């Protein structure tokens, strides 16, 4: 009976470990703040974005949640290491502009290969995923007051 209990614990531990590893490999996120913008921006706004890759690797779903953002105009995934700016690779939010102060889900959707732009135009979604895993991508939210970006976070 004790051997069976131990075996069940080992199996359960293995399943949980594999599930956590699988989730980490198929999910990406970032915390967005003004301090991470280049140059940094003094703002009370902040945000969080979460991505999940489909099992077949053809869709990357996302949800972008923000707090205290004012007059948000756009949000993108950009290429660029921490502290460096780069061009957009995919649109996350393109309007209509959120007038006034806003807290809530700014954007939610799915990215596929046809949504890629800039250096990744015509490439596969796996190319974007590899770029994210390399640490060379960030998300930022643009506003009227800060058209180059008010809050930013490096994807991990």
Predicted regions and their residues:
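Bacterial N-terminal signal peptides
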Residues: 9-19
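Metal-centered catalytic cores of metalloenzymes
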Residues: 19-75, 79-156
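Bacterial N-terminal signal peptides that target proteins for export
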Residues: 1-11
């Amino acid at each position: 009976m004790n051997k069976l209990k131990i075996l069940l614990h080992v199996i359960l531990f293995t399943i949980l470990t594999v599930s956590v590893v699988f989730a980490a490999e198929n999910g990406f996120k970032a915390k967005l703040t003004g301090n991470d913008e280049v140059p940094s921006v003094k703002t009370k706004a902040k945000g969080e974005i979460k991505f999940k890759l489909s099992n077949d690797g053809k869709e990357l779903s996302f949800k972008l949640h923000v707090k205290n953002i004012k007059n948000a105009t756009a949000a993108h995934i950009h290429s660029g290491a921490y502290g460096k700016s780069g061009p957009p690779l995919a649109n996350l939010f393109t309007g209509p502009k959120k007038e006034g102060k806003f807290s809530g889900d700014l954007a939610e959707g799915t990215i596929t290969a046809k949504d890629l732009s800039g250096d990744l135009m015509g490439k596969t979604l796996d190319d974007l995923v590899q770029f994210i895993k390399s640490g060379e991508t960030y998300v930022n939210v643009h506003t009227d007051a800060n058209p180059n970006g008010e809050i930013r976070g490096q994807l991990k």
